[in-house]
Design a protein with these regions (language model features):
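Actinobacteria-biased recognition of intrinsically disordered, low-complexity terminal regions
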Residues: 1-4, 354
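Extracellular glycan-binding segments that recognize GlcNAc-based cell-wall polysaccharides
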Residues: 3-10, 16, 24-347
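Calcium-binding acidic motifs and repeat modules
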Residues: 343-387, 394-398
Length: 398
């Protein structure tokens, strides 16, 4: 049975009705963040940060809460726009464990339904059972045979979209900014390989026949031949590439493309790890705001340029200081950019090196390197995740 059939059966059993670009009965007990100024939403880890975002936008009872992996990005990439369309918070779990903060938040939210994104390798059946026991909610799993099909299943309910975003399914960076853009469009993201457009992704483009398709990322992420395949799958669409010289510049280009008149609110999140931007997407959508990417120690020049161009007075940083830089209220000077990592070369040692935890200065650096190369508790060739909880090199500071 393929992923689409699995989704249809689960939807029927839970009474879920998917219509238009949203979800019937989507919760009305969410609201944009009203605090103004320059501030940070953070917890001591990615799971707690997602909880703090949820607490900032959602009040009980919730009809739907989305749950995705905090350690395995492929299945989780497309969850942000889906949660945003449903006006639902998005919480994170480890593959085989749920943090006490997440359990407490789910109990506070009193959801009628929890939608788990990804298969049992991303979020185990034990975790699903724990969520059921803690909340009594109906549990729905949205999972295809691979990340590409999962992304298309997360797009169920999108009809007659003006624009669809196509991003790499082999790295997470461009999907972070594109997720907020897709949420603005009440649309979805479709995943592709660099050198081939998966059949399930092509079928989704054919099925929805959007007026526009935006391909986020440069040739290092999505090859020109694949760009042509996207055009072939959407012959009636205006297909364009939105790119920059690196992930930060691409995120800036996405924001300036979708919000040409600026935005009253800007969100900032790490460009090295995916979790904070993912769980922040529903909050950004409620504020109709882009997500710009940053480093731990500074804003890249492209991020500063976008912030100045978009002209926001309220700037919300997702995650702690060890992950994401937060500027002061004073304007920052624009200085020449330092060398930036490209999508094809994540920062840190080469995967072929003899890598261990001593190769990194901080836990955040190690975690970002590990995730950038697509590693997970079940795929950890360097043994950085000793206890299999998805958090690597936990003895390192920060």
């Amino acid at each position: 049975m393929n992923g689409r059939r699995r989704w249809g059966l689960v939807a029927a059993m839970t009474g879920l009705l998917v219509i238009g670009s949203g979800v019937a009965g989507a919760s009305a007990t969410v609201a944009p963040i009203t605090r103004e100024g320059v501030f940070r939403i953070e917890g001591p880890n990615r799971y707690a940060t997602a909880v703090e975002v949820s607490r900032a936008i959602a009040q009980p009872p919730q009809e739907v809460v989305y749950v995705a992996s905090g350690t395995n990005y492929p299945d989780a990439l497309a969850a942000g726009p889906a949660a945003a369309r449903a006006k639902a918070p998005l919480l994170l779990v480890a593959p085989n464990a749920v943090s006490p903060e997440v359990i407490a938040e789910l109990k506070r939210l009193e959801p009628s339904e929890i939608r788990i994104v990804g298969g049992p390798n991303a979020v185990s059946e034990d975790v699903a059972a724990t969520l059921k026991e803690a909340t009594g909610a109906e549990i729905t799993r949205i999972a295809g045979d691979d990340r590409y099909e999962t992304a298309t299943l997360l797009g169920e309910g999108v009809t007659d979209p003006e624009r669809i975003w196509v991003v790499s399914g082999e790295s997470f960076a461009d999907a972070l900014a594109a997720g907020a853009a897709a949420a603005h469009d009440h649309s979805m993201i479709v995943l592709t390989r660099r050198d081939a457009l998966p059949e399930v992704s092509a079928h989704k483009l054919v099925e929805l026949a959007p007026a526009q398709v935006a391909v986020a990322g440069g040739n290092a992420a999505i090859a020109e031949a694949t760009f042509q395949l996207v055009q072939d799958a959407a012959p009636g669409a205006q297909v364009s590439r939105v790119e920059g010289t690196d992930r930060y510049a691409t995120a800036a280009a996405v924001a300036k493309t979708v919000w040409p008149r600026g935005s009253a609110v800007l969100f900032f999140a790490s460009g090295v790890t995916y979790a904070d931007a993912l769980s922040g997407t529903p909050a950004a959508a409620l504020s109709d705001a882009p997500i710009l990417l940053t480093r731990a120690d500074r804003h890249p020049a492209a991020t500063i340029d976008a912030r100045l161009a978009l002209g926001s007075g309220t700037r919300i940083t997702l995650g702690g200081a060890s992950a994401s830089f937060m500027e002061s209220t004073a304007p920052e000077p624009i200085v020449g950019p330092a060398p930036e990592p490209t999508q094809s070369t994540p920062p840190g040692p080469s995967p072929t090196d003899d890598v261990n935890c001593s190769s990194f200065a901080t836990q955040t650096e190690a975690q970002g390197w590990w995730e950038s190369h697509g590693y997970s508790p079940g795929n950890d060739p360097h043994g950085l995740d000793g206890n299999g909880d998805g958090e690597v090199c936990e003895s390192l500071p920060g």
